[in-house]
């Protein structure tokens, strides 16, 4: 009888010891929003991609975005408000724009403003890559090429040497995050060309926030 009690007590002790670990090992759901939005379906290069958050409760941030002290300049902290009329958005708004675009709304274009070496590490599904250098004459962009982008990609048109933006798309731009100047450079260039500020949206958090929230990324 004493042996049985001792054995039973040992089993209880073992169960109590492993219980916290078992509870920790059991992942709880990781939705996108409070209220149950768990996934979003978007198109990327003709394929349907499911955007969701990493479901591993123990997952850590990507090492690519773990640095805190990149040299400034050039990696300086960007303001919340980039320019009058340009709306700063967050992750939920970005996902909404991606869903609208993927559903066939061609008045929206989500743009990854980073250079190809950054994009190769991963990008937001549904975005198209337009490196900030493509709109920057100081970096070698020529007026003819810029004009082709404005008309062919953005839906603007030129009349008597002036740009018209009545049918221009809403551009949603991002880069690496709040310490990155690539999408701000694109936005400032567009504003200089006369692009309407209300048709430009800026995801300030960029890839840093997107990655740190465990949201889906794709590689070219």
State each model region's role.
Residues 9-19:
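Bacterial N-terminal signal peptides
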Residues 1-11:
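Bacterial N-terminal signal peptides that target proteins for export
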Residues 213-220:
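Active-site neighborhoods of enzymes that stabilize oxyanions during catalysis
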Residues 23-121:
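Flexible, polar/low-complexity N-terminal or interdomain linker segments that lie immediately upstream
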Residues 121-122, 182-187, 212-213:
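A short acidic (Asp/Glu
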Residues 148-207:
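Catalytic cysteine-centered active loop of the rhodanese-like fold, especially the PTP/DSP P-loop
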Residues 77-169, 220:
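Positively charged, proline/Ser/Thr-rich regional signature most characteristic
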Residues 115-119, 134-137, 177-181, 206-210:
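Solvent-exposed loop/turn segments at secondary-structure junctions
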């Amino acid at each position: 009888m004493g042996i049985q009690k001792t054995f039973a007590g040992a089993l209880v002790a073992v169960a109590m010891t492993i219980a916290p670990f078992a509870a920790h090992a059991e992942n709880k759901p990781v939705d996108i929003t409070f209220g149950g939005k768990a996934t979003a379906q978007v198109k990327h290069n003709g394929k349907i991609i499911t955007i969701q958050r990493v479901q591993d409760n123990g997952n850590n941030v990507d090492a690519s975005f773990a640095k805190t002290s990149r040299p400034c300049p050039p990696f300086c902290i960007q303001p919340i408000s980039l320019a009058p009329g340009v709306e700063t958005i967050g992750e939920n708004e970005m996902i909404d724009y991606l869903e609208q675009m993927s559903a066939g709304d061609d008045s929206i274009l989500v743009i990854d403003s980073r250079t190809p070496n950054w994009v190769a590490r991963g990008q937001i599904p549904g975005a198209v890559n337009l490196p900030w250098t493509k709109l920057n004459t100081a970096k070698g962009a020529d007026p003819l090429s810029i004009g082709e982008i404005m008309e062919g990609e953005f839906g603007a048109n030129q009349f008597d040497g002036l740009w018209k933006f009545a049918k221009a798309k809403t551009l949603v731009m991002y880069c690496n995050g709040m310490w990155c100047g690539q999408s701000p450079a694109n936005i400032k260039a567009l504003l200089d060309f006369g692009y309407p500020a209300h048709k430009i949206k800026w995801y300030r958090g960029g890839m840093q926030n997107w990655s740190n929230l465990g949201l889906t990324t794709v590689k070219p």
